[in-house]
Regions:
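Membrane-interface amphipathic segments in extracytoplasmic regions
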Residues: 1-233
Length: 233
């Protein structure tokens, strides 16, 4: 069957396992696609949705509570090459102050398209106003999520699944190049000790509050039908 895809995009959502996916398969995929004259879009800049015809999209979602905790821990430690914030508030205070930014963060990435590279959808200190003012359109967001070719749940981020995803993606592009994933190497999930400790310290009330704050993220995260299933490949 003739392949209709002419570009590849990793829709990388902050603190959702994108670094792991990049290290496992995406960087290698980029090189293979380039050698086969297939264009690709580098999603490491958290670009949001890209409305491109015949675009092959890969993405991953994370438990909304763990994602929010990880976002705070990353920000608290200065992020990537950033200054460590002064007068750091507690986690729950930070969440309350940044509700417009942090709530349903994953869904927003399917409704947002980054246009200004001097601003970003990641750091509350310099966040893109376009991200903060997104009007949530559940139907549109869910429709776009269903259009993702390979959507992985955080619990699927392992060697076996990534190996299958790599095979599927190359097959979908009608590419027969070989690839290699070192299953002995510990690929970076970019999860810090402080993030894990903070999550483990949350009360049930905290967790319930965060799931409710991220109600649409929670709905799609726990919807098993949207995720990649190796049995279908």
């Amino acid at each position: 069957m003739e392949n209709n895809y002419n570009s590849f995009y990793h829709l990388q959502i902050a603190k959702c396992g994108g670094t792991y996916l990049n290290n496992m398969i995406v960087h290698q995929l980029f090189n293979i696609l380039k050698n086969n004259d297939i264009s690709y879009i580098d999603g490491e800049y958290h670009l949001g949705w890209k409305e491109i015809e015949n675009n092959y999209v890969v993405s991953s979602l994370r438990d909304p509570v763990k994602r929010t905790v990880s976002h705070y821990a990353y920000w608290k430690n200065g992020g990537q090459d950033g200054a460590i914030p002064k007068n750091i508030p507690s986690f729950m205070v930070w969440v309350e102050r940044n509700t417009d930014f942090i709530s349903n963060y994953q869904i927003k990435n399917f409704l947002y398209e980054r246009k200004n590279f001097h601003l970003n959808p990641f750091d509350p200190r310099g966040v893109d106003p376009d991200f903060l003012t997104i009007k949530i359109n559940k139907n549109l967001a869910f429709d776009r999520i269903k259009r993702v070719n390979v959507l992985l749940k955080d619990t699927q981020l392992n060697y076996q699944t990534c190996d299958t995803v790599m095979k599927k993606t190359l097959k979908d592009f009608n590419i027969k190049d070989s690839f290699y994933i070192d299953n002995e190497k510990k690929y970076d999930h970019n999860i810090t000790k402080s993030s894990t400790e903070l999550y483990n310290s949350l009360t049930k009330q905290d967790i319930d509050y965060l799931y409710n704050l991220n109600s649409l993220d929670s709905e799609i995260y726990f919807s098993q039908s949207v995720y990649f299933n190796a049995k279908d490949f």
